[in-house]
Swiss-Prot record:
Remaining remarks: Present with 237 molecules/cell in log phase SD medium.
Biased composition (Basic residues): 881-894
Any one GO molecular function term: RNA polymerase I transcription regulatory region sequence-specific DNA binding
Organism: Saccharomyces cerevisiae (strain ATCC 204508 / S288c)
Protein name in the entry: RNA polymerase I-specific transcription initiation factor RRN6
Compartments it resides in: Cytoplasm; Nucleus, Nucleolus
GO cellular component, one term: cytoplasm
Length: 894
């Protein structure tokens, strides 16, 4: 067994364990790992079979799905009566109503909808009689005298209490009896079942000024990442604010989907049945049951309901006190005599707790058709309503409180508490067990936390993507679990926070995941190498009428959303920094992290290759070869500039180039100090060739706002900032330093600029030459500015007159000097620059404006003594050029 297969005592993060057995298990019978491994029998504490960047999700699609402020009027879409009792009679309406026009029209939100029972009367003029006015002559009533000192003290006390109180945004109040007022599911009508159709994806949501209008519409998909709502919307006025909307999900064992929509309003519970969906116009025909008014059932507000996944005609409800009941749904809503919802007399009970003050309650079916789960803030209770027994499964009164629960499938559900995300499953005896839990470290006092889950099916496992959101902010906490055979649940080890971009600072009212992801067609052997993850959901913000569609993917889209802000929150320092930032800072942080992710994806393969071959990679040999190639390419560039000198003068083009453009494969090294030493030697050598370079010290000062003596110091200071951003901070910092240096490193030849400047000046007409000649005529200011702003000394790398190698030696093989001498070399360069300003170069022995064809590279292996560098005198001496330039310097050209 290899060392990597032995379980170690690594920190498990916030995971509280795999099941109840332990964090690391030995599995002698089954192998849960991939086929490519050599069948290790150790069950790892987290699922590490996926690639590291497999869960690096970005927003690839953001679109407005619908606006609930736009209201619709529907005239005959609600079926109330029918001559036949069969509930399938209206299911074929889509084949018989091809010529039927649209029955819904868009109404201006300002114009109110007038009910039919409202009658209009003639205009009545109301007289403005004086008896309704205020008598100004009435004397002021007697008031008690209060000393001004007392009033002043009261004002000071009130101001102090106001300043010491919590901000208003923290004092957020919400109605716990209001659940999701938005839902979407696939439904199957009777016609779909007869014709073996998969069904139709619909959306149901509340709208209107009071939220009393139920809207049902069809969702259409162009492809996997584009979702649209059909414009033909069925709207029903319920005359009472809607508090909850649910479209049930049926069990996979019955082989069909439901066609029901359940609604809770302030005074009733009602169920709608979708009878048909027109195949072309997408017209939705619905029928409704009679409202079950709360005055008929103890006059208590019903806060939640659930449908039986195994019996679509059965439902369960629970009120604010914890009283629950089981009921039956009529098979046909089209008969007025059989439209009433019936509660079964002997199937009811209560979990009333006098110590529980919250009216928040939830009810959901469990692992069997006769078992339900009932929740309040402090406990989860399993109830078998057929055998008349119940047991308390979870008690959350001390350490944490229950926040939400969602059903995953017939055997599992996910429970959100104030401190954990818990996957609850059913054992072989259908008893609830705790599969796995993850400590999320969110605000334990936030009672608005909710959770939703999306299942992503893969060939050998299922991914459960959990979204935790709050009505207090716009951040979504995402954590992924994997579900493999034999009820093995594992965490994937890290969490991600996604900031919803745009809009005002507000909370998230609803996140609705869409059940359509199915990747069964992907081959199992390619699942881990080409892993593609796509999740999509609908988002409705608090106090907003717009519903947005989002799609997340771990692959880059052709048009990525620039406002995505995925933040890794496993580091407490980074999470604290992000939470305390304002909106503008968060936008900058999001853009920064997006660039980090993009850079990691672009260079992750090359960086990993460098790490794997770090020992076998000869760094010194690579840098030596890099120096040779850079020197040869520079010599060729200088020769080409000299050959095209006359053409450049006529065209007015300047001779300059980036070092990055001269080389390929210039980043395959890891030592920043040795790279800095290489650049120092390269700059020193080309000082005799009339070539200048940008001074890095001045430019690096702009990044850190402090003096930076070298690249190694710049790297260390950047590293201190990047350790909060990414676990790969060292590698990323090196890549950033390389990018900065190669993007800033430019070479130019100043001797070629003077003829171009003179040519441009001569080409101007008389008036323009006079204007240019009038610039900088003050000799005193000229001298001061010349001393203060000397471009040669501030923005050019100074030169030494000594080449880095002995060119007259035939036997000496040059090697690049170590980085320890770089500081001394820099000091010599500074002194040399100061001496150059006082003593110009002598042109009697050398003229550096012309390069021969036999130019010697800066880094050469062997140099014969006969190849000496010769120079040809230029037509215009360099000293006269400098004197002329100093006498009359033209701004903007020289």
């Amino acid at each position: 067994m290899s060392e990597g297969q032995i379980p170690s005592s690594d920190v498990l993060g916030s995971q509280l364990g795999v099941g109840v057995q332990g964090a690391s298990l030995y599995c002698p019978q089954e192998n849960y790992t991939t086929k490519k491994q050599e069948k290790p029998q150790w069950l790892r504490p987290v699922d590490d079979t996926l690639a590291e960047d497999a869960l690096d999700l970005h927003i690839v699609v953001k679109s407005l799905l619908c606006d609930t402020a736009i209201r619709y009027i529907s005239d005959d879409k609600v079926l109330q009566e029918s001559d036949a009792d069969d509930d399938l009679i209206t299911s074929d309406i889509d084949e018989d109503t091809d010529n039927q026009g649209d029955t819904s029209i868009v109404v201006n939100p300002v114009i109110p909808v007038v009910p039919k029972d409202v009658h209009f009367f003639k205009k009545v003029d109301v007289g403005n009689d004086s008896m309704f006015g205020v008598n100004c002559d009435t004397p002021v009533s007697f008031q008690d005298y209060i000393p001004s000192d007392l009033l002043r003290n009261l004002d000071d006390t009130l101001q102090e209490s106001t300043n010491s109180s919590r901000p208003m945004q923290d004092a957020f109040f919400w109605d716990p009896t209001v659940a999701n007022r938005l839902d979407s599911q696939y439904i199957q009508t009777a016609s779909d079942l007869r014709n073996y159709r998969d069904g139709t994806e619909i959306i149901a949501y509340a709208s209107g000024k009071t939220g009393s209008v139920l809207n049902i519409a069809v969702l259409t998909r162009q492809n996997t990442l584009h979702l649209n709502r059909h414009n033909n919307v069925t709207s029903i006025e319920l005359h009472s604010p809607i508090k909850s909307i649910k479209i049930p999900g049926a069990s996979e064992s019955i082989g069909r989907r439901s066609n029901l929509v359940g609604i809770i309003t302030e005074n009733s519970f009602q169920i709608f049945r979708i009878e048909s969906v027109h195949s072309r116009s997408c017209d939705v025909m619905v029928s409704s049951s009679e409202p079950l008014y709360f005055v008929e059932i103890d006059d208590l507000q019903v806060v939640d309901f659930a449908f039986n996944p195994w019996d679509l005609q059965q439902f369960a409800i629970i009120d604010i006190k914890g009283n629950w009941s089981i009921g039956r749904i009529p098979k046909n809503f089209n008969n007025n005599n059989k439209r009433k919802l019936q509660l079964i007399d002997n199937l009811h009970g209560t979990i009333f707790d006098p110590e529980e003050l919250s009216s928040w309650k939830r009810i959901e079916w469990f692992s069997h058709f006769q078992k339900i789960l009932v929740f309040d803030r402090s406990k989860m209770i399993e109830i078998d309503f057929m055998n008349n027994w119940q047991t308390e499964v979870v008690q959350a009164k001390a350490w944490s409180n229950i926040r939400d629960y969602k059903r995953i499938d017939d055997k599992n559900g996910i429970l959100l508490t104030s401190r954990e995300i818990i996957i609850v499953g059913a054992s072989e005896s259908n008893d609830p067990v705790r599969r796995i839990s993850w400590k999320h470290d969110l605000d334990p006092d936030d009672t608005t936390l909710r959770i939703t889950v999306q299942k992503v099916k893969k060939p050998d496992h299922i991914l459960l993507v959990a979204f935790v959101y709050s009505m207090r902010h716009k951040r979504i906490y995402m954590h992924v679990f994997s579900h493999r055979k034999a009820n093995l649940f594992q965490s994937l080890g890290c969490s991600t926070v996604l900031e919803i971009p745009g809009g005002t600072p507000t909370g998230i009212e609803t996140i609705l995941t869409l059940d359509h992801i199915d990747d069964e067609s992907r081959r199992e052997e390619d699942a881990d190498e080409n892993f593609e993850l796509v999740v999509d959901f609908l988002v409705k913000l608090r106090n907003s009428s717009e519903v947005y569609y989002y799609a997340l993917s771990n692959t880059q889209n052709s048009e990525p959303n620039k406002q995505e802000t995925p933040i890794i929150v496993d580091h407490p320092e980074w999470a604290s920094l992000f939470n305390n930032a304002d909106e503008r800072e968060k936008e900058s942080i999001g853009a920064l992290v997006s660039q980090i992710k993009l850079k990691e994806r672009e260079r992750i393969s090359r960086v990993q290759n460098l790490i794997e071959h770090e020992n076998s990679h000869d760094e010194d040999k690579y840098l030596q070869d890099l120096g040779y190639r850079l020197s040869i390419a520079t010599n060729e560039l200088l020769e080409s500039w000299q050959k095209t000198k006359d053409e450049s003068i006529l065209s007015g083009s300047l001779s300059h180039s980036k070092l990055k453009n001269l080389l390929e494969n210039s980043d395959s090294f890891a030592s920043i100090p040795e790279f800095s030493s290489l650049l120092d030697q390269f700059f020193q050598y080309y000082q005799d060739q009339d070539v200048t370079f940008i001074g890095f010290e001045k430019l690096l000062h702009l990044f850190l706002h402090e003096d930076v003596p070298g690249l190694d110091i710049f790297y260390n200071k950047l590293l201190q900032c990047w350790v909060l951003v990414s676990p790969q901070a060292e590698l990323l910092t090196k890549e950033i330093v390389k990018d900065i240096i190669w993007s800033l490193a430019r070479l130019e030849k100043p001797s070629l600029f003077e003829p171009i400047q003179n040519e441009i000046s001569r080409s101007l007409s008389g008036p323009y030459q006079d204007i240019i000649s009038s610039w900088d005529m003050d000799d005193i200011n000229e001298e001061d500015e010349s001393n203060e702003f000397n471009f040669d000394s501030q923005f050019s790398a100074p030169f030494n007159g000594r080449p880095p190698f002995n060119l007259n030696s035939q036997s000496q093989i040059p090697t690049i000097k170590s980085s320890q001498s770089s500081g001394l070399a820099r000091r010599k360069r500074i002194l040399k620059t100061q001496s150059q300003k006082a003593t110009p170069l002598s042109q009697s022995t050398q003229n550096l404006s012309v390069l021969p064809d036999s130019m010697t590279p800066a880094f050469t292996l062997m140099q014969p003594p006969s190849s000496q560098i010769s120079f040809v005198n230029d037509s215009q001496p360099r000293n006269s050029q400098k004197a002329k330039k100093k006498k009359k310097r033209i701004r903007g050209f020289g």
